[in-house]
């Protein structure tokens, strides 16, 4: 079958059919002899209780194991953020960005392995992952969300953890006139500069012509100002076996290795230790404007046919500004205090310098726009009593692009060269940095150093056609069947304008001191840190000063002073102090993924000894072709520009490559449900599912970092031939629906997963660049002055001032072919492993409404275990599953006499969130986190339809902390604060 012909002919046929049924000759009049219906009073339960009843009914009547969340009323979802609502479901946990729910993990499988659909349609994403960002969509037009934890043949593939279907409102589902408007003010306590921001939304739904035609129009606009405080260890921690030191002459050294002497409790030879690359304090402000809109048109000329045309629009503009202060460790001779092994970490890590080093203070100001649209058409046709058909087609696109004169990411650095030593105490939650001379730094000391202006544009397009049918065999059985064609096109482009003047340019007095207001650091954090008590015999001056300088003023001054006359820069402005839109000069990647699928499912319902049961046996076939074309920047020289940085010089040329991959799977599924006693359901299921690799992993081409170090460079390469993860799934569940809005459930799940994707580090001499830190001059300097990078560079400047590869005024040493060894790049390449990993767990939930009191509670707990955990003692990548953690929720609610109140406690245990840092195969663990949210609303009796409400998130100001192989190896601590909103909602 020709897929293109199928797409066109089916769509054309369906549209013709819709037009045809509207023709007077085909649309016969309603039966005039129909009996007049008796008037029956229908009581509709809304609010919290109504939402819980509807969700419980959906769960009870499902063909597999499923959880659901339903709107409390039209246009009113339990939370303003969908991810915040989803985390209340058993086994679901979320990731937050700037304090707001963003992505979900289900049963230990991270966002990439949970397929999110909108009305059953796959949605495009622009992050290179497969995870949908729930922060982009408003909940105002959402009718419900279903989380399918077991697979059915009719479900699309891609979700090993779950398939999450977000369902939007449809006018014919709620006939009549409906109109809702709401307004709110949001106070985000995480920002010191912002103020209360508005949220407005409106929804109009109506049906006409005896409910045969319906229209729904909804829109929302939200502004939000937020901020956060971060403490980071930059690119991460470098890990070594204890035998590694800084003795290059003995052959036991690696870059970052600590001396054998002058240490307290130094790790032994067979232990593993880690050293930090830097310590950074970062203070960020963010402004967001989110716009959502949806138009739905429905036409049902007869009871047996219904056509739906819908368009959904989402836009999220995010502007970010930040200031930071940092001290980069140069791995000069260090003196440190260590924890006990076998995984050893510094309680205090310190370095002392012969020459003063930089105390860096950077700033950024940039913006991005995320924009997406989806146009869909759906036709449902009950052909006769036995056969019903559904056709669905949509074309959707999403784009992420710069939305600022400074690009999608910008960084400009200044520095005062005052640092005589640097030390960090890692004994507390907050890393505490001490810098010799740091608190005495003045605005006059600051000089402009390096800068990066980046522009990234990512676009994803999905065209999907689905044809489904249901054929009834008899009263007990029917067959579901269908075919689909899905094409996903991803295009990612990026270009950087980078200055590598990290040694500083200009002179004192170039920058106006009034542009550099000083502020203190530690009063901005609530987390506690150490006080260097583990280090005896020396006092440290804890850094408590940062210049919160204005990005634009310094950028403009630097552009004016440090752009040579006649110089043509790479930026669109003609200098190197702005971004470029010349994507053709840098990285350009295009990937097409085309999937064809077909399924058949047999459904059987009967009684066994008076106990109703249903059986669903299905088979799904998936065939996928991947084509990736890439063009990446090439480099022709390596320049040693600072103690710890070797910059790569772009040649202006690009390398082109096209790669392909394909795979196909036959995926069975069995779901069995029986009401073993009245109101008690037992369920059992077996299925085989796949989870496709993220889009970045299947992109072709090798991209290297533009900054290397003395040990070489790094980079990454995609692999279009990657296979999906494969999982054999076993599920069992028992559910007791003992009262209205009340149930108790327990479930067990087991997943045997193969084809785990791991990153192999491959040594490559790509570009054949001479390494200036690995050659004749370097070895002579090493023998003369030792391993300190600053001393080595100064020795080369002093002894080779006339060498063409040595630029003494510019403080640059370039690689020299024939004299220096070729630079080695560690290239991360994803590949499928042969290991099998078993993930299993238990889920427990109780939902109870206390009669007519109005009180109720929801309690759930999920335990997840893996047969293979990350081994912190192994220094290479491992096939460990990220996102695996236990979770719990406690929700108390009250609803009576127009008053609704809810308080929710959410907890997630520590979990592995990544198997790699920028320094290589070093793990990242997100520590256990809990959050308390609350909301209260009141229906004003004086004005029918008017509700006022108050919401509060993260009431106790919890923060998120990430560490490496040990708790002391902090990578990131982020404090995002609490958020409050007050508003009113009017429906009529």
PLM-predicted stretches and their roles:
Residues 82-85, 102-105, 117, 133, ...:
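N-terminal periplasmic accessory domains that precede
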Residues 194-334, 367-378, 383, 388-389, ...:
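Transmembrane beta-barrel wall of Gram-negative outer-membrane proteins
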Residues 121-149:
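Short acidic/polar hinge/loop motifs at secondary-structure boundaries
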Residues 370-372, 591, 661, 690-747, ...:
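Outer-membrane beta-barrel signature, preferentially recognizing the C-terminal barrel domain
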Residues 6-9, 14, 28, 452-454, ...:
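Conserved C-terminal beta-signal and adjacent last beta-strands/turns
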Residues 44-75, 103, 111-114, 121:
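N-terminal periplasmic "start-of-domain" segments of outer-membrane beta-barrel proteins
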Residues 752, 757-762, 768-916, 956:
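Gram-negative outer-membrane beta-barrel transporters
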Residues 83-122:
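Extracytoplasmic beta-strand/coil segments of soluble accessory domains associated
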